[in-house]
């Protein structure tokens, strides 16, 4: 699957009538597992990227180069379309252009640009938002930088958790006017909030962590939600598994008695061992 076909697959989700559950992915193996299990799209969250690449919390320490290289590795490993959290675009509107170019070249099917002021400004104890005008400019810059018109650009606002529903809607309308392909909202908790957002906008909606009140997939689909992020449990599960295994090993548990390990069959599957062996036979004269 080419980069463009992945982007077209993401666009098909956004233009459809269902709400998709994305797989939270963070490396080549998680990409392959998600693809093999039948997920339609992967979400590479900013917090997950910070954990996977730096081992740091989500405080905007990661660089564009680090993010793009990880996306490139993931894109190479599987054909699953990836929606990448590009945070604030790593700077101003001109930096956003570079961000789009790098992530497009790395194989991202789509990316989100948000209006949170990152990194956190000096002296501010709580998250802040950039001005609507600056956010509008960032979206216009992102669209201008796009080499492949099928690359999905998503405008994201965190206003609902910081200012108000009215501000979130005003920002979303500005990003829609700028030409984004979809709108991403965080901190939507109630049906009333979601219905107000859906009524005030026309584009496909992506939700970050919908609350229990609105976690009905038919309802979400009816409100034009096409992707609903379900948190990032896989990297937490992987972290716990590594911790438990190393804890047992440190306590003296023999390797053959360690619990919860992937079988050799699963390891062969996720590493595409049979394909690598076939290539060895084809190109190195090795026996199958």
From Swiss-Prot:
Gene3D superfamilies: Phosphoenolpyruvate-binding domains (3.20.20.60). Belongs to the isocitrate lyase/PEP mutase superfamily. Oxaloacetate decarboxylase family. CDD domains: ICL_PEPM (cd00377). This is Oxaloacetate decarboxylase. GO terms for biological process: oxaloacetate metabolic process; propionate catabolic process, 2-methylcitrate cycle; pyruvate biosynthetic process. InterPro entries: ICL/PEPM, Oxaloacetate_deCOase_bac, Pyrv/PenolPyrv_kinase-like_dom, Pyrv_kinase-like_dom_sf. It catalyses: oxaloacetate + H(+) = pyruvate + CO2. Binds 1 Mg(2+) ion per subunit. Catalyzes the decarboxylation of oxaloacetate into pyruvate. Seems to play a role in maintaining cellular concentrations of bicarbonate and pyruvate. Pfam families: PEP_mutase (PF13714). Its cofactor is Mg(2+). The lineage of its organism: Bacteria, Pseudomonadati, Pseudomonadota, Alphaproteobacteria, Hyphomicrobiales. The keyword Metal-binding applies. Mg(2+) binds at residue 85. Keywords: Decarboxylase, Lyase, Magnesium, Metal-binding. Homotetramer; dimer of dimers. Signal peptide: none annotated. The keyword Membrane does not apply. GO terms for molecular function: magnesium ion binding; methylisocitrate lyase activity; oxaloacetate decarboxylase activity. Substrate binds at residues 47, 156, 232. Its EC number is 4.1.1.112.
């Amino acid at each position: 699957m080419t980069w463009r076909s992945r982007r077209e697959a993401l666009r098909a989700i956004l233009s459809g009538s269902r709400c998709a559950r994305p797989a939270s992915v963070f490396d080549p193996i998680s990409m392959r597992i998600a693809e093999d299990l039948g997920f339609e799209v992967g979400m590479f969250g900013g917090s997950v990227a910070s954990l996977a690449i730096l081992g740091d919390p989500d405080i905007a320490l990661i660089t564009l180069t680090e993010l793009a290289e990880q996306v490139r590795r993931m894109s190479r490993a599987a054909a699953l379309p990836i929606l990448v959290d590009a945070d604030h675009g790593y700077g101003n509107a001109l930096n956003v252009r570079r961000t789009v170019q790098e992530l497009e070249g790395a194989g991202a099917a789509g990316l989100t640009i948000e209006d949170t002021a990152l990194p956190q400004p000096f002296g501010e104890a709580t998250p802040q938002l950039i001005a609507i005008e600056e956010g509008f400019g960032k979206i216009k810059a992102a669209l201008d930088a796009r080499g492949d018109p099928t690359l999905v650009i998503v405008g994201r606002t965190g206003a609902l958790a910081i200012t108000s529903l009215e501000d979130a809607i005003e920002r979303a309308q500005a990003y829609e006017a700028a030409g984004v392909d979809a709108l991403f909202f965080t901190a939507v908790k109630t049906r009333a909030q979601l219905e107000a957002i859906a009524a005030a906008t026309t584009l496909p909606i992506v939700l970050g962590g919908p609350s229990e009140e609105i976690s009905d997939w038919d309802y979400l689909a009816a409100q034009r939600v096409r992707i609903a992020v379900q948190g990032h449990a896989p990297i937490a599960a992987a972290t716990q598994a590594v911790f438990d295994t190393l804890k047992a090993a440190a306590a003296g548990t023999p390797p053959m008695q360690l619990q919860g390990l992937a079988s050799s069959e699963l390891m062969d599957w996720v590493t595409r061992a049979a394909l690598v062996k076939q290539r060895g036979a084809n190109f190195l004269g090795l026996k199958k």
